[in-house]
From Swiss-Prot:
Pfam families: tRNA-synt_1c, tRNA-synt_1c_C, tRNA-synt_1c_C2, tRNA_synt_1c_R1, tRNA_synt_1c_R2. The keyword Protein biosynthesis applies. It catalyses: tRNA(Gln) + L-glutamine + ATP = L-glutaminyl-tRNA(Gln) + AMP + diphosphate. L-glutamine binds at D310, Y450. GO terms for cellular component: cytosol. Keywords: Aminoacyl-tRNA synthetase, ATP-binding, Cytoplasm, Ligase, Nucleotide-binding, Protein biosynthesis. It is an enzyme of class 6 (ligase). This is Glutamine--tRNA ligase, cytoplasmic. The lineage of its organism: Eukaryota, Viridiplantae, Streptophyta, Embryophyta, Tracheophyta.
Length: 795
């Protein structure tokens, strides 16, 4: 902490030395990016011993505004500033505009100087003449408006005729001219102007309504197409990042024209992305967002997206996960251009590691994991860091041949152990693991790290857009450092916010724990937000993709998306695609006393609410018999004004059937539990009750309806963000997150339902047939409740 304070004070002293006031200097160090940029600019300009205030202000502007696509030209601009060839803000803004359009390409100095007014001296006499002319042109207006005159407009007129004039002199002469023409300010000049309110005629109401419709804002281009934020492949020439080294030097990483041209020739200018999951678990809804970004961008641009398995850890990968990932990607509606594995490139990666050593950018290290951690905390170099290149080459070959024991050596990248970015602390490139690889077999006993393989394979596959979540943003420096060190093509990297949804966990470690320890019923437990769990629950890939698209591709990190937002998209989709049917969860017997026991009335029930009468496929048959069943929650002994269920002496309408009126209640032996209800039906439908109930009837006397099992799911965790509970997160699991109802009754048409079929159980919600179903025993999972459970326990 003391070290940080010391560095801060040194930065403040440095910034004050170029003319910044202390307050500005202290505010600046609160912004790490500006601090790093300004420090670099001061060193590049060679003014670490200080400079005049005007120069310092220009340098500050360079640090905060210089175009990132032309950082290779920043030293040139700084020379012009330090040598007083560019000395006004107007010249500097012109320089920024020039370099923004030039980018990293070479330019002619004479064109640059002409664009920035280098060498043009505007005398005070020239400025005075211009100011005088502007005042003569606008004298009448100035006399009318006096000191309310828009001085900015006058200033702009002068700058238009003399763009390189010193703004301070221009302002001074305008002020003098105003005083000369108007004299001292009067009391009236200091009064705020009063605006006359114009009477506006009220348009007719019909016109008002029309106007609202006509002025409705159209969705932005980004809302219609979230991929507009990404550049085209041919634009990949800008400086991707600046790597600030502890010695004050700066590495600016960008593709050369030759490298970019070669890349574009291979790709044909197409967009190439990749979806790179590690096959060590099942994919969850966060991966759905990654797929939407990676596959979606490629599809929108007519490009290609790899499905690349990041299989660098032989001990974590399983064939089960590999098969699951490929299958679930296709279920989500995405078609990989090609399926690859990082292990496909093990030989190329090894050869590049050898080249990295030869170039002096990697070394074989013998520190233990604890020693590496300690040295990183102290920002100390490994004692083996500066060993001879030939020695590292020999040892790395011995690592490959299995001569060195596991844990006794690693290959580390020679980056910067004193950097402010911990991702530059000589990251491990290779480690020894005597474990067979699921795909590569026993050919290798050294395996590349994520930090080494990820960016390298991106380059080898000519990825144009390497897209990942924000926690990888600090890895940009090491990503581009490695590609630059190997002279490889550099993809465009962009980070977006991780998808966090309430009342669940999406950490693979935590998911693996609750699956392994039987807190849930496997990776596809419907309570999990794994994609297989959502699918088993009855959620469609269309709904998931709509949810992800609705969130957008943002960089605002840390926000939790409420699970109700996902449920909204699920309902929207199932409302359009799930046929209606009737199931009674907790059956209560109703005997229709005025219907003969052997009489059966066949009725039409709607599969779709907007079904046309002439479309027979939109209807299904339901029997109405002497014995029907309603839900226990739809009956009360005591009626109330806001209750629309059944009660003694009260009528309700059985959906698609007839009104019935409760005439008697039969109790069980305890004289409290209602065993059955007696009712009369109204075959003429003369009564018009408000309450409408779903129901299921016996299809023949004494034959009970189809019995099904229904599983009701609630949120798996009680807290919106169980991660905040740290080690106590398991105590937050909702013990009532799963309820099994084994004796529900269903209409007979459901007997042929297949696994995965989805339905709306009227008045209850959306349900899907579970894989645990067997012949004669259907199991349904509740996907999501209805938006409005009308008539349930109230209105």
């Amino acid at each position: 902490m003391v070290l940080k304070d010391d560095n801060s004070e040194k930065s403040i002293e440095l910034f004050i030395s170029i003319g910044l006031d202390e307050k500005t200097a202290r505010n600046t160090i609160n912004n790490n990016k500006v601090t790093a940029n300004l420090t670099a600019v001061i060193h590049e300009a060679a003014v670490t011993d200080g400079c005049d205030r005007n120069t310092g202000n220009l340098l500050y502007s360079v640090a905060t505004k210089f175009p990132t696509n032309a950082l290779v030209h920043r030293p040139t601009l700084l020379k012009y500033i330090v040598n007083s060839k560019i000395k006004t803000p107007a010249q500097l803004e012109a320089a920024f505009a020039f370099f923004a359009s030039t980018g990293p390409e070479d330019f002619k100095l004479n064109e640059f100087e002409e664009a920035c007014g280098v060498g043009i001296e505007v005398s005070p006499e020239d400025i005075e003449k211009a100011v005088k002319g502007i005042f003569e042109e606008n004298k009448k207006t100035i006399l009318e408006q006096r000191y309310r005159t828009n001085v900015g407009e006058l200033f702009g007129h002068v700058r238009k005729s003399l763009p390189w004039a010193d703004p301070k002199i221009v302002k001074k002469l305008i002020d003098e001219k105003m005083y000369e023409l108007l004299g001292e300010k009067t009391a009236a000049d200091n009064e705020k102007p009063t605006k006359k309110k114009e009477k506006k005629e009220k348009p007719a109401k019909v016109e008002e309504k029309k106007a609202v419709v006509e002025t409705t804002a159209e969705p932005s281009e980004e809302e219609l197409n979230p991929y507009t934020i990404f550049p085209q492949p041919e634009q990949n020439f800008m400086v991707h990042t600046e790597v600030f080294f502890s010695d004050g030097s700066i590495l600016r990483c960008s593709n050369t024209k030759e490298v970019l041209d070669k890349h574009l020739k291979v790709t044909g200018g197409k967009v190439y992305t990749r979806f790179p999951p590690e096959p060590n678990g099942y994919l969850h809804i966060g991966h759905a967002k990654a797929m939407f970004v990676d596959f979606g961008l490629a599809k929108e641009r007519g490009g290609c997206c790899y499905l690349r398995y990041d299989d660098t850890n032989p001990e974590a990968e399983k064939e089960e996960y590999i098969n699951h990932i490929e299958e679930i990607v296709k279920w989500m509606g995405w078609e990989p251009f090609k399926i690859t594995y990082t292990s496909d490139y093990f030989q190329e990666l090894y050869d590049l590691a050898v080249e990295l050593i030869r170039r002096g950018h990697a070394y074989v290290d013998h520190q233990t994991a604890d020693e590496i951690k300690e040295y990183r905390e102290k920002k100390m170099n490994s004692p083996w860091r500066d060993r001879p290149i030939e020695e590292s080459l020999k040892l790395f070959d011995e690592m490959r041949r299995g001569i060195i024991e596991e844990g006794k050596a690693t290959l580390r990248m020679k980056q910067d152990m004193q950097s402010d970015n911990f991702n530059m602390y000589d990251l491990i490139a290779y480690r020894i693991k005597f474990a067979p690889h699921p795909k590569a077999g026993d050919k290798w006993c050294i395996y590349p790290s994520y930090d080494y393989a990820h960016c390298t394979v991106d380059s080898l596959e000519n990825i144009t857009h390497s897209l990942c979540t924000l926690e990888f943003e600090t890895r940009r420096a090491s990503y581009y450092w490695l590609l630059h060190s190997l002279s490889l093509y550099m993809p465009y990297v962009w980070e977006y916010s991780r998808l966090n949804v309430t009342n669940t966990v999406m950490s693979k470690r935590k998911l693996n724990y609750i699956v392994t320890n039987k807190y849930v019923d496997g990776w596809d437990d419907p309570r999990l937000l794994t994609l297989s769990g959502l699918r088993r629950r009855g959620v469609t890939s269309t709904a998931i993709n709509a949810f992800v698209r609705g969130i957008g591709i943002t960089r605002s990190d840390g926000s939790m998306i409420h699970v109700s937002r996902l449920e909204h998209h699920i309902r929207e989709e199932l409302n359009k695609t799930a046929p209606r049917t009737m199931v009674v969860l907790n059956p209560l017997k109703v005997v229709i006393t005025n219907l003969e026991s052997d009489k059966l009335i066949e009725l039409d029930a709607k599969r779709w609410p907007d079904a046309q009468n002439d479309d027979p496929s939109a209807f299904y048959k339901v029997p109405f018999s002497r014995v029907v069943y309603i839900d226990q929650s739809d009956f009360r002994m005591k009626d109330s004004k806001d209750y629309y269920g059944l009660a003694p002496g009260k009528s309700v309408l059985l959906r698609y059937a007839f009104p019935i009126k409760c005439t008697n209640v039969v109790f069980a032996d305890d004289n409290e539990t209602v065993r059955e209800i007696h009712a009369e039906y109204d075959p003429e439908k003369k009564s018009k009750p408000k309450g409408v109930l779903h129901w299921v009837a016996e299809s023949s006397p004494g034959e009970e309806p189809i019995k099904v099992e229904v599983r009701l799911f609630e949120k798996l965790f009680n807290s919106e963000n169980p991660a905040e509970l740290n080690d106590a997160w398991l105590t937050d699991i909702n013990p009532n997150s799963k309820m099994v109802i084994s004796g529900a009754y269903a209409v007979s048409t459901l007997k042929d339902a297949a696994v995965g079929d989805r339905f709306q159980f009227e008045r209850l919600g959306y349900y899907a047939v579970d894989k645990d179903s067997e012949p004669g025993k259907l199991v349904f999972n509740r996907t999501v409740t209805l938006r409005d459970s009308y008539g349930k326990g109230g209105k």
